[in-house]
Amino acid sequence: EYDKDEVRIVISGDLFESKNTVSNELMTFSSFFLRQLEEIAQVLVLAGNHDLVLDNTSRTDTLTALFDTANFDNCKFLDAMLGYTSGCIKDGNIIWAVYSIYDSYIRPDIDELKEEYPSCKIIGLYHGLVVGATMDNGSIIDGGTDSDAFNGCDCVMAGHIHKRQVLRRNGINIVYPGSLIQQRFGET
């Protein structure tokens, strides 16, 4: 037994696979899926590289289209809440530090919030590559975001890499949970 108001389900990007090639069935299924999750607990969604066309951000992305039409009760699109920029959202005793793909992951002002709310845990939300992470084919990432960008976070929930792993950097766990739905054998 749990209190539904004290639990969060986080989707760290790539709810969709097809960027902006969307069918009615995909929108119906995605809406149904998120509605099922929000019955369990509040759902927090972060955009990933497959949820938008990065080289043409003037086009409406798939998540914005879904959230603008679905009218969810207990599901939040964090990037949209922050005006499609990185930033922080206080949620009870948690501060969600959103590193938004829309502004190339500008580091949120974590230090100021840590002083203002010293008893809150700061959880970074990020969808991208972290230097030193392992891809599902075994290769090690040497480009991407340096883990120093997450200093001040108590932990980071990351998406993009489909291989489950925990990176321990500067005393901070950066967790890639793996794929929501397995796409290839290497994602197991």
Regions found by a protein language model. Name each.
Residues 87-149:
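Binuclear metal-dependent hydrolase catalytic cores centered on His/Asp/Glu-rich metal-binding motifs
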Residues 9, 43-45, 96, 122, ...:
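Hydrophobic/aromatic residues located in beta-strands of well-ordered beta-sheets
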Residues 1-85, 149-153:
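Core catalytic region of metal-dependent phosphoesterases/phosphodiesterases
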Residues 82-91, 167-169:
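Short acidic-hydrophobic surface loop/beta-edge motif
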Residues 1-6, 105, 110-115, 121-124, ...:
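A structural signal for the main folded, soluble domain(s) of proteins
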Residues 24-27, 58-62, 111-112, 137-141, ...:
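Short, glycine/charged-enriched secondary-structure capping and boundary segments
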Residues 131, 136-188:
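Conserved beta-sheet core of the metallophosphoesterase superfamily
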Residues 13-14, 48-49, 127, 159-160, ...:
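Active-site glycine-centered loops adjacent to acidic/histidine catalytic or metal-binding residues
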